[in-house]
């Protein structure tokens, strides 16, 4: 899956992460990942020729369980439907969890501002509602 020029300009981090498989044996599989301002794209190969799995930031609740061992940094992404996805990266490249967390915070802030502006526009577009709300205020 090719990324558009717009997506490429929004890349926050690109590199390798290991993802723990969901099957019974739970092997760690190396994945090429691209974090943008809106999603974490996970590819099976380094050339990004395979179709990516896109984990939208709006579907991520938090980055949790950060643990550092001698060789790896382990962390878990918890989705809004409470699914847990385990990742690890080498200790040399230990800022993946921080960059994902910061991207998530930035995304949530942008969404909150957008929601606030939408609410404000809705209220300013109908002054009758605003007056009736003020009339109810003590």
UniProtKB/Swiss-Prot annotation:
SUPFAM superfamilies: PH domain-like
PH domain boundaries: 11-105
Cellular compartments per GO CC: cytoplasm; membrane
Positions of the UniProt region annotated as Disordered: 117-138
Zinc listed as a keyword: no
Gene3D superfamilies (alphabetical): Pleckstrin-homology domain (PH domain)/Phosphotyrosine-binding domain (PTB) (2.30.29.30)
One GO BP: positive regulation of apoptotic process
Pfam families, per the entry: PH
GO molecular function list: phosphatidylinositol phosphate binding
Keywords, sorted A to Z: Cytoplasm, Membrane
Membrane-topology descriptor: Peripheral membrane protein
Primary location group: cytoplasm
Signal sequence bounds: none
Subcellular localization: Cytoplasm; Membrane
Function, as annotated: Plays a role in regulating placenta growth. May act via its PH domain that competes with other PH domain-containing proteins, thereby preventing their binding to membrane lipids.
Domain notes: The PH domain binds phosphoinositides with a broad specificity. It may compete with the PH domain of some other proteins, thereby interfering with their binding to phosphatidylinositol 4,5-bisphosphate (PIP2) and phosphatidylinositol 3,4,5-trisphosphate (PIP3).
Family, per entry: Belongs to the PHLDA2 family.
Stated name of the protein: Pleckstrin homology-like domain family A member 2
Gene: phlda2
């Amino acid at each position: 899956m090719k990324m558009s020029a717009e997506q490429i300009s929004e890349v926050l981090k690109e590199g390798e992460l290991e993802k723990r498989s969901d099957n019974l044996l739970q092997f760690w599989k190396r994945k090429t990942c691209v974090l943008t301002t809106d999603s974490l794209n996970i590819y099976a190969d380094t050339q990004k020729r395979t179709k990516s799995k896109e984990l939208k930031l709006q579907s991520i609740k938090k980055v949790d369980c950060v643990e550092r061992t001698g060789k790896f940094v382990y962390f878990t992404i918890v989705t809004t439907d409470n699914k847990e996805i385990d990742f690890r990266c080498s200790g040399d490249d230990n800022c993946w969890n921080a960059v994902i967390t910061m991207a998530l915070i930035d995304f949530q802030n942008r969404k909150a501002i957008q929601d606030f502006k939408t609410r404000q526009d809705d209220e300013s577009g109908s002054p009758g509602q605003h007056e009736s709300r003020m009339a109810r205020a003590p």
